[in-house]
Every structure is written in C-alpha cells, then in structure tokens.
Amino acid sequence: MSGSWLDEIPARIAELDAAHLRRRRRATAPLQGAASGAHMEVDGHPMLAFCSNDYLGLAGHPTLVRAACAGAQAFGVGSGGSPLVSGHSTANAALEEQLAHFVQLPRALYFYAGYATNAGIVPALVGAGDALFSDALNHACLIDGARLSRAHVHRYAHADLGDLAAQLAASTARRKLVISDAVFSMDGNVADIRGLLALCDQYDALLLLDDAHGFGVLGPQGRGSLAEAGLTGANASPRVLYMATLGKAAGVAGAFVAGSDMLVEWLLQKTRSYIFATAAPPMLASALQASVALIEAEDERREALAERIAELRAGLTPLLARTGWQLLPSRTAVQALVIGSNATALAVMEGLRERGLWVPAIRPPTVPEGTARLRIALSASHTRIDVQLLLTALDEVSRLAPPLP
C-alpha cells in the first residue's frame, strides 16, 4: 500500500531547495524617522531597501496616518459586513466617487485586495464559450481569473499586437475579452494601450487593464497609464475597464476598478470576490482619500522618482557591459536587472544584504526560466546617495558572484 500523499511534501520542498526556488519570508518593520519606501528593518537589521512598492513614499506619510486614525475613531477598525449587506460605509462610498473623478471615468468600485479584484472580475465578464486573450507576462491574478472564468484562453506573445490581432481575427466567439497589465510587474515596461484598444474596437472585444504599477506614478498628476494614453474623460471608451491597486503608489491597501456605469454595475452584481467578502475597513478608505489628494497635488514626488530612475539606469551601464547582465527597458519604478541563473541571483541578493541593502531575487515561476533577476523597485523616498550606494554595492558583489553559466 502506498503512503499518504502528505508524505511527498518534504521531498517536494527539498526539490525546491535544490533548484534554489524555495521562498522565504522576512519580518520587516519601518525604521523610525526614516522615509517609507526606502528604509526598513529586515529580520531586525536596518536596511536600505529597493524592493518596496511604496513608489511615492506615502505609506508612512503623517497625513495618511492621521486620516486612518480619524477613520478608526469614526467607524471602528472593521467594516462588519460585505458591501451589499452592511459593509459599504459612507467612507468607502466617498472613496469610490473620488477615485472615479481622479481617473476621469464614470464610476469606480472599491475592493479589499488587488488579487481578489482581478481574480473576481474576469469570471464576471466571460465564461464557458467565450474567448479570453491574455498577454504572456500578465500578473498571476489575471491568469488565475482567466482560469476561473472557464472561457477559452488564448495566450498571445508578450506585447505582440500582431499575434493578438491574428488570434482575435481567428476567434468565432461572440464575447471576447482582452486582459493585460498596463505596467508589467516584473519587467517594468508599459503596454501599448492605444494599440490594444484599437484591436478591441476592431474585433468588438472588451479590454481589462491592470495598472497596479502605473496608478499614482504615470499620467498627468499620477492619474495612471490610461490617462497617459489620453483615453479618459471625454476620450474614455465604454469597452475599457481600468483596474488599479491602492497598496503601491497610494501607500495603503485594496484596489478598484473603474469604467462605464453599465460595466461597473454589472461587476457589482456578478463579481463573487466583491459580493461574498467582507468590505474593506472604512479607516483604510479614509487614509486613501488623503492619499489620492496628495497624489494629485504633489508632482514633485513623481519628479523625484523620475530622477532616481534616470540615475540608476545611467549608473548601471558599466556593470552591464562587464557582466553581461541585462537591464530591461523601463521608464517606471520597476527596474529589472536580469542575471540569469537562480544561484547567481541569490548570491547577488545575499551579497547586497551583507552590505545593508535589501533587494530580493525574483525567480521562476514568477519569471520565465533562465531570467532570474533583481527587481529593483525605486521610490520617491530614495535619494541620489541611496542610488549610488546601490550601484557601488552591485559593482562589488558582481565581482564575487558565480560566473554566468
């Protein structure tokens, strides 16, 4: 008789170890008096961090902290129910109106988590017998939403509009949905949103964009990738749904989806991850209202971030020439330094950690085989000196790291 399948788990974990693919958590905390997004305590040690998604340095902003405290005083710390029962607080309702106005789309729906947003809205839009077209490098939440939908999934080559057009043309499905990251989370490049919409117009498809890494950073006043493409306000398309998270540049937590009143109403009626989950606490909505106001008002944060991006990319040029590592094209806060092998990426990460810098290595299956990398995340909180410290440490560590295979 064979043993329990539970007996296989230790061997499977050992396989992850052997392939340098086992994931480990680190306990982090903010450093008192230090800027959020750039400095943190990692396993009890102070670190200069290049891994936070706090792109504008707002997570510890005193205005947000005060707003959250005021929200807790007014509403308590929990919502007490799902949105369609008793959890849709006046704070959450006000945030939805503010978000819709900010991204210049008719209506917004506020969710408690980004992953649950995409995993829920995709199955609400398409199902069995429908066709779904997904970029090869989409985030896991879009991929899982596609799987849950039971629609026929067509995976097109990354950012390849020609491949997408051919697959759309070949489809006989009446209902079609194209899903894409707006800013790709592991590469940092921005999708051709106008090109995607043109194809959706041509083939009568809906377009769902995940702007987790563009909201607050790109576009006029940080209104996001869709606004940067000039496709909001009077130019908004009724076939576009715009999703963005609120735990990255906004510095808090949650997510929202915005679009036409009709599409958002449909999502409210049919998205299981919205209907059957406890609503986000009102205190977070209070903090987010303050965050969106700061995002809109403070262009200097985006300007500082743009300066750090330019400094990093220019400073890495000698390292790339010497090591053969690759810095992927990106004008966003996500800067992917592709090293290749898992072992080398881990060695570089460890060397940086020993020097007081925290830049975790990203390995398969999060990224394709052979493209293990440092995902360098920049923040407006980083200084020119911070970037120079990273460049110096990378130069030192790269000379000690195992050679490329």
UniProtKB/Swiss-Prot annotation:
Alphabetized GO MF terms: 8-amino-7-oxononanoate synthase activity; pyridoxal phosphate binding
Stored InterPro entries: Aminotransferase_I/II_large, AON_synthase_class-II, AONS_Archaea/Proteobacteria, AONS_Proteobacteria, PyrdxlP-dep_Trfase, PyrdxlP-dep_Trfase_major, PyrdxlP-dep_Trfase_small
Positions that bind pyridoxal 5'-phosphate: G114, Y115, S185, H213, T245
A GO biological-process term: biotin biosynthetic process
Pfam families given in the database record: Aminotran_1_2
SUPFAM superfamilies attached to this UniProt entry: PLP-dependent transferases
Keyword annotations of the record: Biotin biosynthesis, Pyridoxal phosphate, Transferase
Catalytic EC class: transferase
Positions bound to substrate: R23, H139, T366
Superkingdom of source: Bacteria
Catalytic activity, as annotated: 6-carboxyhexanoyl-[ACP] + L-alanine + H(+) = (8S)-8-amino-7-oxononanoate + holo-[ACP] + CO2
NCBIfam families linked: bioF
Protein name: 8-amino-7-oxononanoate synthase
Organism encoding this protein: Delftia acidovorans (strain DSM 14801 / SPH-1)
